[in-house]
């Protein structure tokens, strides 16, 4: 491809509304253009990268035995009402009416549509297991679209759905999809982690997210430094570092703390180690009108997902108001603790290993110092309540946890019978009786993968594409293309490279575009390999080569270039 026949729309300045690096670089490199909030047009350069990601996803899905279909983007309300999600999904679901006043939605996901397809097309156990997938544009009416393609309203997604007679069959397909996803992200050249995850609004039982590691990620993920263990921070089990509780060495005393309403104030004013303090959070109980206290160490954070999953706690999690707390306990937030607490309490594991700790006295402006379990008060119910922190023991017993930011690019679920039961999706089993199908679903944000790759691969000059995603493999830049000798050599080399199967962008812009601008554009776009043709090089029988990730320029004998590139690019 020649730039004279291409849309090369690079920008020198970064648009003011672009916050994350992928958004900035995709706009500056001329890959996308904003149409409206959360809506983007893919320009030719960006579309090449997107199609490469899509092709790898399709190849691995086909290899894993999934069957490609294409479902409508517009879905009838009746299907969503049948599953119960029409009311549950919320304002992210864009609802529309046709001219006959029939209700539809623009699909953010396709569980209902595929379940309807399955119940109409599948009738016998002999057709199972089966796994359908599509690569299609989705729409979610995000309240605050931001970060370009990272959180847009319209996006390209690969979603797959499998149907099974047994949990064992589902597990086999789930494992196959897990491996297919690992293959996809490995082929894309990304540093990623599959992590145990909460199932969220999709529902179901088992769940894994796939995260590309990047500082701009919205999720915290925890993984072992010595094994394959990894989990979303919402899901990661918090194992205390301490093995046993130290013996008590202080007397219990009641201390006036009128100006210490927070852990930070208590620690600062009294010189306490923060790990020797606890905080008591009061939430609504599962039983109406009942409050429950959740107690974690002062330097730890309550994990709201874990808390909401407790049998005694209302879900979704709801914190009690100050008025409710005062009515039940007689003191306000900031002065609460486990001693003489008149409501049920659940403490985190780490709290049970404390000795000589400080806690609110359930009297405004007062705390107990030197508290000790079993001497001063019995241990209440114990549960895993907190977020893990870096350095915690890995739950699999191997090494310590590292916490990094991640961008979620894939998610797989074991749905169970949530949708098939609601929508009466059954087949005849071996005994001739109807059997409700067990489902799995498997999603990849294809357009988000492209943005995530940039978040992980860039420098001060532009994008550093992984080889598999680069829009072009080679940038061919002639110096003085108006020179007959340079033009002839460049055109001949371009033809040879294309004939050898390489994707080449020939920068044939005229002399009004300086070599420096050409080099800067090719680096901004992120083409992995650059070849320069010059009069001096031709006189010496050499071509100038520079890898995008390298600082040094090499002089390559012109006769050896194809072999050289074959070794570098892997042909």
Swiss-Prot record:
Subcellular location: Cytoplasm
Pfam families referenced in this protein's UniProt entry, alphabetically: HGTP_anticodon, tRNA-synt_2b, tRNA_edit
Keyword flag ATP-binding: yes
A molecular function GO annotation: aminoacyl-tRNA deacylase activity
Example of a GO cellular component annotation carried by this entry: cytosol
Keyword Transferase appears in the UniProt entry: no
GO BP term, example: prolyl-tRNA aminoacylation
EC assignment: 6.1.1.15
Reaction(s) catalysed by this chain's protein: tRNA(Pro) + L-proline + ATP = L-prolyl-tRNA(Pro) + AMP + diphosphate
Keyword entries, A-Z: Aminoacyl-tRNA synthetase, ATP-binding, Cytoplasm, Ligase, Nucleotide-binding, Protein biosynthesis
Taxonomic superkingdom: Bacteria
Similarity section: Belongs to the class-II aminoacyl-tRNA synthetase family. ProS type 1 subfamily.
Subunit structure and binding partners: Homodimer.
Job of this protein: Catalyzes the attachment of proline to tRNA(Pro) in a two-step reaction: proline is first activated by ATP to form Pro-AMP and then transferred to the acceptor end of tRNA(Pro). As ProRS can inadvertently accommodate and process non-cognate amino acids such as alanine and cysteine, to avoid such errors it has two additional distinct editing activities against alanine. One activity is designated as 'pretransfer' editing and involves the tRNA(Pro)-independent hydrolysis of activated Ala-AMP.
Record remark: domains: Consists of three domains: the N-terminal catalytic domain, the editing domain and the C-terminal anticodon-binding domain.
Protein name: Proline--tRNA ligase
Organism: Azotobacter vinelandii (strain DJ / ATCC BAA-1303)
This protein's encoding gene: proS
């Amino acid at each position: 491809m020649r730039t004279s026949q291409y849309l090369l729309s690079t920008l020198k300045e970064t648009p003011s509304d672009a916050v994350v690096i992928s958004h900035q670089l995709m706009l500056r490199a001329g890959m996308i253009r904003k149409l409206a909030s959360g809506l983007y047009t893919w320009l030719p350069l960006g579309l090449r990268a997107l199609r490469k990601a899509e092709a790898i996803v399709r190849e691995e899905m086909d290899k894993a035995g999934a069957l490609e279909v294409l479902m409508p983007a517009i879905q009838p309300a009746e299907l969503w009402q049948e599953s119960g999600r029409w009311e549950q999904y919320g304002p992210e679901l864009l609802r529309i009416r046709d001219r006959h006043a029939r209700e539809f939605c623009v699909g953010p996901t396709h569980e209902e549509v595929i379940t309807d397809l399955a119940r109409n097309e599948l009738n016998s156990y002999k057709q199972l297991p089966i796994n359908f997938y599509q690569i299609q544009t989705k729409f979610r009416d995000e309240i605050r679209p931001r970060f370009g393609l990272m959180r847009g309203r319209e996006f390209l997604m690969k979603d797959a759905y499998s149907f099974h007679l047994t949990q064992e069959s589902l597990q086999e397909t789930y494992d196959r999809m897990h491996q297919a996803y690992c293959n996809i992200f490995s082929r894309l050249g990304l540093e990623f982690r599959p992590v145990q995850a909460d199932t969220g609004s999709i529902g179901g039982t088992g769940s894994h997210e796939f995260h590309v590691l990047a500082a701009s990620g919205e999720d915290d993920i925890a993984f072992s430094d010595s094994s394959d263990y990894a989990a979303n921070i919402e899901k990661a089990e918090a194992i205390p570092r301490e093995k046993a509780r130290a013996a008590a060495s202080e007397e219990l005393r009641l201390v006036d703390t009128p100006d210490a309403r927070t852990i930070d104030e208590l620690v600062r004013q009294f010189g306490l180690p923060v790990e020797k303090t606890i905080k008591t959070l009061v939430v609504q109980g599962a039983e109406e009108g009942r409050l429950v206290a959740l107690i974690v160490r002062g330097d730890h954070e309550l994990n709201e997902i874990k808390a909401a999953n407790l049998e005694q706690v209302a879900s979704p999690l709801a914190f009690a108001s100050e008025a409710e707390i005062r009515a039940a306990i007689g003191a306000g937030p900031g002065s609460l603790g486990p001693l003489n607490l008149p409501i049920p309490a659940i403490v985190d594991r780490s709290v049970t290993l404390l000795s000589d700790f400080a806690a609110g006295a359930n009297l405004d402006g007062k705390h107990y110092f030197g508290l000790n379990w079993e001497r001063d008060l019995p241990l209440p119910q114990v549960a895993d309540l907190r977020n893990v922190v870096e350095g915690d023991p890995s739950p699999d017993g191997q090494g310590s946890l590292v916490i990094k930011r991640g961008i979620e690019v894939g998610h797989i679920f074991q749905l169970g019978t949530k949708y098939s039961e609601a929508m009466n999706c059954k087949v005849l089993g071996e005994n001739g009786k109807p059997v409700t199908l067990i489902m799995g679903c498997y999603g990849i944000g294809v357009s988000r993968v492209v943005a995530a790759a940039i978040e992980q691969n860039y420098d001060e000059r532009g994008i550093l594409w992984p080889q598999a995603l680069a829009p072009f493999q080679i940038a061919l830049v002639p110096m003085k293309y108006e020179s007959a000798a340079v033009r002839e050599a460049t055109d001949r080399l371009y033809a040879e490279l294309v004939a050898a199967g390489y994707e080449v962008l020939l920068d044939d812009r005229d002399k009004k575009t300086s070599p420096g601008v050409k080099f800067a554009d090719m680096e901004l776009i992120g083409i992995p390999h650059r070849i320069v043709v010059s009069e001096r090089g031709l006189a010496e029988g050499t071509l100038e080569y520079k890898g995008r990730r390298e600082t040094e320029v090499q002089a390559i004998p012109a006769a050896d270039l194809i072999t050289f590139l074959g070794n570098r690019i892997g042909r």
